[in-house]
């Protein structure tokens, strides 16, 4: 039976990030994904690398600071799939006073190590604005767009580039400790072929299924509860020709993004709905469609109806249960749990997390795993470039060269 240093179960952004980091430190790594890479939560995001402006209202300063710093790192790691984007925030005084927004944006500008992105500014909307006439003022700040699925794929490519192995459509069916090692069994979901490996360490990065794998795959108690929060988006024909995205405030204190996508479309989302079903079966509800249309139509001159929707998508955020009353108040921060058996066979489990902070999450995961591996290499991903990201010149020059081809 083949022995690996580390087996990572889960081919979303957290699993791929941990596997890539571990492989780059010299460990023999195997990553198992039951379906396809980024097939669940990681490809159903708002496709943003952002600090999370709204998290400041929940006093999540550590998370915002880390996310803002990582935003700068990821722009350098993945310039081919991550791009700066300006966000316009229409001011609606009865929801949040201007002074509160200014303080929030000041903190947003300064909490992270912002070096490449312009800071926030105030705006006045004139007669040619795409917004309704009563919306006359607003704010603009910087965040970034990313191709979420390709970010996962690039990390999986890095696993292979660093000597690791990635198996998709291979479901881990069980994992147990035996003689100081993990015995991991898996099955090819297409052919039924069975596999088994030994591993010195195991990572449970199965996202919405993290607790289920504890219960059914390892028959161990999960150290934390998970709350599944559904986020849905609608995709419509491009609602304006501007390059900027919009971040809309709603009466329930939530925010909704309107994001340019693929030149011809706009993504509108997201929602926050408690979800109890199978994560694979998640889909948008009519109430969510009505909610997103209402928030959009409250702000924009160009009105949308159900008939304008060309596509919808939904994902499930696996958030660590902090007993918050409402879905939007649950922390988006991550928790890493590690335990072993007599100093061997560590199990590291990932609860929560964000697309933006995946690299730092992976680095923290390897910090926890390092004591179990003699001779493991140092942290390295902060200065790395993901496969495909080694472009010559700046991003605009690179894009122009591609267009000329």
Regions found by a protein language model. Name each.
Residues 2-4, 191-201:
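Core beta-strand elements of the Rossmann-like FAD/NAD(P) dinucleotide-binding domain
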């Amino acid at each position: 039976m083949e022995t690996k240093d580390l087996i990572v179960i889960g081919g979303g952004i957290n699993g791929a990030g941990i596997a890539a980091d571990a492989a780059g430190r010299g460990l023999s790594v195997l990553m198992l994904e039951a379906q396809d890479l980024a097939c669940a939560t990681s490809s159903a995001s708002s496709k943003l690398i952002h600090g999370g402006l709204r998290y400041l209202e929940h006093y999540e300063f550590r998370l915002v600071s880390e996310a803002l710093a990582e935003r700068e790192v990821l722009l350098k790691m993945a310039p081919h799939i991550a791009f700066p984007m300006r966000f316009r925030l229409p001011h609606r005084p009865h929801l949040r006073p201007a002074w509160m927004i200014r303080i929030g944006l000041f903190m947003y500008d300064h909490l992270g190590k912002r070096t490449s992105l312009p800071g926030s500014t105030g705006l006045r909307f004139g007669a040619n604005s795409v917004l309704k006439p009563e919306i006359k003022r607003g704010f603009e700040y910087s965040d970034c767009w990313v191709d979420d699925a390709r970010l996962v794929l690039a990390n999986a490519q890095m696993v292979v580039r660093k000597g690791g192995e990635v198996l998709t459509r291979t479901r881990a069916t069980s994992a147990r400790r035996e003689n100081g090692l993990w015995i991991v069994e898996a099955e090819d979901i297409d052919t039924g072929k069975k596999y088994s490996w030994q591993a010195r360490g195991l990572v449970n990065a199965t996202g919405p299924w993290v607790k289920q794998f504890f219960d059914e795959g390892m028959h161990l108690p999960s150290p934390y509860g998970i709350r599944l929060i559904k986020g849905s988006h609608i995709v419509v024909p491009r609602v304006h020709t501007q390059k900027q995205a919009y971040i809309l405030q709603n009466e329930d204190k939530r925010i909704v993004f309107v994001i340019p996508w693929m030149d011809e479309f706009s993504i509108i989302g997201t929602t926050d709905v408690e979800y109890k079903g199978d994560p694979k079966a998640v889909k948008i509800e009519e109430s969510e469609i009505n909610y997103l249309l209402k928030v959009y139509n409250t702000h924009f001159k160009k009105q949308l109806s159900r008939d304008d929707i060309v596509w919808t998508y939904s994902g499930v955020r696996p958030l660590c249960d902090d007993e918050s009353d409402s879905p939007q108040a649950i922390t988006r921060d991550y928790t890493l749990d590690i335990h072993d058996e007599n100093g061997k066979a560590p199990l590291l489990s990932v609860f929560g997390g964000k697309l933006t902070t995946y690299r730092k999450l992976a680095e923290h995961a390897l910090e926890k795993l390092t004591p179990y591996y003699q001779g493991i290499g140092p942290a390295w991903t902060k200065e790395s470039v993901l496969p495909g990201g080694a472009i010559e010149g700046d991003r605009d020059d690179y894009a122009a060269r591609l267009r000329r081809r």
